[in-house]
Amino acid sequence: MISQLYETHVLPHLIGCACGAPQIMKQRSRLIPQASGRVLEVGFGTGTNLAFYDPAKITEIVALEPSEGMRRKAAPVIAGFPVPVTWLAEGAETAALEPQSFDTIVLTYTACTIPDPDRALASLRKALKPGGQLLFSEHGLAPDEGVARWQRRIEPVWKPLAGGCHLTRDPAAMITRAGFSITRIEAGYLPKTPKIAGYNTAGCAAA
């Protein structure tokens, strides 16, 4: 009961604050305007990315979000958006996505929480149209062993408090393993962010 209350009422606010930090918002502001056509946003959350889409370039956003608490918090944001936003209340691993149906798939600060990221990413690749793009920005495993060691130590405690967030996943490796071809990538520590959660990988990939 307490766990359910935490996940429904407390966690969405905590994640909204963390994912809305200035250094994270800067990453979003650089990535999201590149989206075009029919868009699938994986882990839509509280709708933080909406402010950065260019409505003139997109036709629809399908918002994949299994959390009822997140969807409820995002509702007022969606209400004022000029492009249709359609909810898909499922996880990325189980969602029935039509093959080759999206021009852009957006993955921002979500891969860390997906229970089976390999299965999810394989499904996303099939849902991307030929010539489409996967836009991603994710935190993950640091290249410095001292930081990585602390990530491994802290992760078991961190995960239940942070909605299942893993600190030790390698976003680029997961994306490549799923069959995507990364066409552009940049990585490094975000400023004014604890290094255990601040190693960021962002870029674009094709199916």
Question: Model-derived features: where do they sit?
Answer:
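Conserved alpha-helix/loop element of class I SAM-dependent methyltransferases that forms part
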Residues: 18-38, 48-52
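Class I SAM-dependent methyltransferase SAM/SAH-binding core
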Residues: 40-95
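A short glycine-rich, Lys/Arg-flanked "PGG" loop and its adjoining helix->strand segment in the class I
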Residues: 118-130
